[in-house]
Structures are given as structure tokens and as C-alpha cells.
Amino acid sequence: ELLENHRALNELAHRLDPTRPTTMANVFMLEITSPILEIPDVNSYNLYFGWYLGELDQNDDFFDTYHAKYPDRCIGFSEYGADANPAYQSAHPEKGDYTETYQCVYHEHMAKMIADRPWLWATHVWNMFDFAADGRDEGGKNGENQKGLVTFDRKIKKDAFYLYKAYWSKQPFVHTCGSRYVDRTEDVTKVTVYTNQPQVELFANGKSLGVQQKGEYPFFYFDVPNSGETTLTAKAGDCTDESHLRHANEPNRDYVLQEEGAVINWFEIETPPGYMSINDTIGDILATTRGKLLALRIVQMVRANMKKNKGGSTGGMADMAKGMKINKSLIDMGKGFTVKRVCMMA
């Protein structure tokens, strides 16, 4: 029935306007061998490897596998992104920490991945602005999806905004990332600069840290000595940008998401030997005997709850999963989720 509905919609779209190709945004759970992909003129996928699950390189692997299997099919990237609260910063950005720093790591990878694959017919960064999402309470904001390159109130352009400006804008500019990351404990800190100019020179308290020429991508990385107070000045052509650093003896807790009952701070994680935590992936837990037994108990509880509800709505991701075909690809992807992420999505 689902396939027939999509075929009917595809035919209707062609009748209404034969000049326009049809397409469809597919979520990552859909196998690339699904017959639904044969219906529209061109295909596209929403992928969130490196944010909700898995690693960043899995985005590359997914598209390479698809293109190798179907070299004559058009494939696009219909949705990708990572939430970031610009108040949160880190010298050790990690998936799921909601830092502005990790959002840059994420989008730098995606920008490179896209640039290296010219056969992607279209790509859609998700999203330009943070937007309302009633069911969310995460990343320090209630009721917001923070995947935007600009904050909800349109007042702050996050660092990742300037990454895309470096690619898409002809207006000369230079931007130093991490201007909101002032207090830093590391003796040598990494500073990233984005620009659409051919070269960048970075100064620390007036002393040049070197000139870098633009390579294949418009990202420039500098190792900056961090002692006392430092004023950074990036120069690219006639453009300049200034920011400030300050050496701190202790991490600034304002830079880290504080969640009651959840260990998420990289400098606070203390898991006793022989134990696992909500920050471990489903795959790692299932690799243990006790983990398999726990999973079996959970499945039994879910089945009992479904019988109790007699097919009624349970809310959250559970409703989305109804009727979904469980396949090896879906199971492998699910193993990439941490327990914490699964609980947040339930």
C-alpha cells in the first residue's frame, strides 16, 4: 500500500508539471535496495552520522556505497546538521556535547565530504536558524532545535555560519572561531580561522604566528601559545578579525552543559572499572553477556507494554518505528546510539 501511494503521488506530480523532476527525502533507516527509491526521478537522504549516532566517516561511506551500487542514479543530501548552543565551548569537542566547537568539527567534515563528491545533485544543511521544537529539552534550551547556523533570535551567527560564508560568499571577510571561548586551560590552544581570501596571517599580542595559504578547503588551523591574556588578530587581505584568550587554571563550567543526573562533562567522567554508563553505545553494551541479558529483558518489557496498549500510541520515536522493517542495516545503525541518546529520543 505504501509503495502504491508513492507511485500515485509521483504520477500526479508529473501530470501537474511534466517539466519538474520528482524527489523524496529518505531517512537513514531506509535500505538503499528499497524499491521506494525507484519511484522518484532523483533520490535524497537525511543522514545524521556523527550526531545522533555513529561517526562522521559513515556519511562518506554511505554515499560512496550508494554511488558504487547505483552510479547512474542521482543521489542528494537532503538533511544534515548538529545542535550547538554558542554558550558551550570545548578544547575536546565530542559528538553530543552541544558545543559550538563540535558543530564546527561536524560541518568542516561535511563540507569536505560534499566538495569531494561532485556527483551529489544537491545538499541541504539543516538548518539556517534555530527553530521551535516543542518536544525537545536538551542542549540547555527548552523547546528549541539548535541545529541552526544562527540563533533563534537571529542575534548570533554561530562559528559554523562563517564556514559556509567562506564557500558561498564573494564578499571578502575573515572570521576567527572561538571568540566566545575565552577561558582556556590548555597551554597551547587550537584556533580555527575561516575566510574566502587566499591567505591568512594570525597575530598573538601583535606577534605573527605565521601566514597560511588557502589549500583545498577554506579552513586554517593555528596552534597558539596560551599564557596570561592574549589578543588574537586574524588578517586576510584588507579584512581583520579580533578575539581574546585568557589562560585559566580550572575549566570554566559555564562552557559545559550541566544536566542533573547525567555525566556528560569530559573532565568529570569517572566510570568504575567493570561498569558501563549511559554514555556507552548500544553496540558496546550488547558485546557483553550481561548486556545481552539486559537487552532481552527490555525487549520483553516493550512487548508487554505494546500488548497492554493494544497498538495505541506510545509517543516519541516508538510511534515512528511502528511498521518499520527491521533489517541488518537498521540494527547496525542502532548499535551506534548511546543509551543516553536513545532515552532522549524515546
PLM region spans:
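Short strand-edge motifs at loop-to-beta-strand transitions and within beta-strands
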Residues: 218-222
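Edge beta-strands of extracellular beta-sandwich domains
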Residues: 238-265
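N-terminal targeting or regulatory segments adjacent to alpha/beta-hydrolase or S9 domains
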Residues: 277, 282-283, 290, 298, ...
